[in-house]
């Protein structure tokens, strides 16, 4: 199942715990404003965090000229002619930008807390400390999907959203989670933005991701149940054939009364009806 990280982590599940600035405070505030404008264009779980930061200064946001996402690193964009870098330490190292020592970063990044850096041109200006949490309903549905044998593939522009983070927060195995690279992520966006031809709806939801997960899990369970019922019915037919053949060979067909046949059919009917319910 393909999902967007913004649906997996809706507003309120990613919380800003603190901001560490590097250099002057004015430069850090300017960098955060530029990053806020950039994330408003990009979207994703971090956009809600930056909306909280600049809630009173939305009219003062600078103009975004373009951006790219680097796999597992973060966003690099142009805002008012300046290069804004927003992402994990690996992104800054790849761009040869100095970042704090890993030991210093580890003081903030532990458990459900993660950090993300903001850089302007060639300088790191700020580090945001974020806490990620799992929505309870989404967590339950993801676990149910995993039990049904369905994996989840996430489209994200947030470098902190990794299979390991999703696995830890939602209580599922890392093997059940995948993350799209930038190329496939772009293809995903094209597909979801395309207009879908009109068709008869076999299932309808209100658009919530957990509702769609619930539907998919239910469909998988129904398919398994149908397969089990068919197997039980086949076993009943084979057993009936063997029993009749055995009685015919020994000339005991006269012992099959209407009551015995009725009870035999009633037994298998009870098995077919009750066993799927017990399985659930």
Each model region followed by its residue ranges:
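Asp-based phosphoryl-transfer active-site loop
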Residues: 1-21
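Cytosolic beta-strand hydrophobic patch enriched in CBS
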Residues: 2, 75, 114-120, 154-155
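ATP-binding catalytic core of ATPases
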Residues: 19-71, 94-95, 102-104
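ATP-binding glycine-rich phosphate-binding loop
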Residues: 66-74, 90, 107-111
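Conserved ATP-binding TGD loop and adjacent catalytic N/P-domain core of P-type ATPases
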Residues: 79-81, 120-258
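Small-residue-enriched core segments of transmembrane alpha-helices in multipass membrane transport
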Residues: 255-270
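Juxtamembrane helix-loop transition segments at the membrane interface in multi-pass membrane proteins
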Residues: 275-280
């Amino acid at each position: 199942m393909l999902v967007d990280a913004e649906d997996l982590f809706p507003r309120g599940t990613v919380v800003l715990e603190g901001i560490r600035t590097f250099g002057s405070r004015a430069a850090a505030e300017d960098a955060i404003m530029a990053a806020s404008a950039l994330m408003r264009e990009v979207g994703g779980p971090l956009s809600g965090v930056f909306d909280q930061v600049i809630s009173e200064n939305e009219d003062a946001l600078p103009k975004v000229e373009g951006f790219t996402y680097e796999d597992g690193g973060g966003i690099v964009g142009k805002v008012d002619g300046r290069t804004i870098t927003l992402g994990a330490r690996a992104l800054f190292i790849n761009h040869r930008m100095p970042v704090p020592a890993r030991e210093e970063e580890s003081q903030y990044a532990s458990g459900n807390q993660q950090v993300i850096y903001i850089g302007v041109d060639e300088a790191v200006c700020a580090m945001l400390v974020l806490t990620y949490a799992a929505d309870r309903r989404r967590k339950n549905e993801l676990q149910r999907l995993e039990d049904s044998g369905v994996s989840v593939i996430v489209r994200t522009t947030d470098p902190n959203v990794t299979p390991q983070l999703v696995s830890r927060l939602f209580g599922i195995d890392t093997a059940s989670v995948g993350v799209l690279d930038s190329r496939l992520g772009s293809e995903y966006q094209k597909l979801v933005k395309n207009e879908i031809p009109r068709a008869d709806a076999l299932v309808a939801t209100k658009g919530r991701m957990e509702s769609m997960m619930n539907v998919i899990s239910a469909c998988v369970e129904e398919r398994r149940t149908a397969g089990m019922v068919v197997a039980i019915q086949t076993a009943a037919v084979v057993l009936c054939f063997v029993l009749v053949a055995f009685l015919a060979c020994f000339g005991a067909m006269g012992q099959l009364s209407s009551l015995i046949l009725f009870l035999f059919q009633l037994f298998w009917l009870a098995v077919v009806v009750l066993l799927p319910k017990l399985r659930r």
